[in-house]
A protein has these predicted regions:
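Catalytic pocket-lining loop regions of alpha/beta-barrel enzymes
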Residues: 1-43
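Active-site donor-binding loop signature of nucleotide-sugar glycosyltransferases
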Residues: 7, 48-50, 67
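Histidine/acidic-residue-rich catalytic or RNA/ligand-binding cores of hydrolases
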Residues: 15-18, 53-59
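Divalent metal-coordination and catalytic microenvironments
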Residues: 18, 49, 72
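Short, surface-exposed, polar/charged, turn-prone segments marking secondary-structure boundaries
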Residues: 31-34, 52-53, 73-75
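A short, terminal or domain-edge coil/loop segment
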Residues: 32-41, 55-61, 83-84
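Short acidic/histidine-rich active-site segments
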Residues: 42-53
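Mid-to-C-terminal alpha-helical segments outside catalytic/metal-binding sites
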Residues: 58-86
Length: 86
């Protein structure tokens, strides 16, 4: 069963340690930008809490990763489907 750490705010080294143990991380507006930039595409998960809109988190990820919003949206959809085996 896959594990997904909600609200991950650690750095790239911690993220890599979790990934090496099969644990995924979900990132929001308060995530470390370097972590957002370095998370592999197939392991990118985004989230929102409170008053934050998911579009804000997607825009942040797109900006930090220098990718289009549609690319990030498609990655998130694909990764969630893979995680949930849909």
């Amino acid at each position: 069963q896959p594990w997904l750490v909600h609200g991950f705010r650690g750095g790239p080294v911690q993220m890599a340690q979790l990934h090496s143990n099969g644990i995924l991380v979900s990132l929001g507006l308060k995530a470390d930008p370097l972590t957002i930039k370095q998370v592999p595409q197939e392991r990118l998960f985004l989230e929102t809490d409170g008053n934050t809109l998911i579009s804000q988190v997607i825009e942040l990820a797109a900006t930090v990763r220098n990718e289009s919003i549609s690319t990030i949206q498609n990655l998130i959809i694909r990764n969630n489907r893979n995680l949930l085996s849909l």
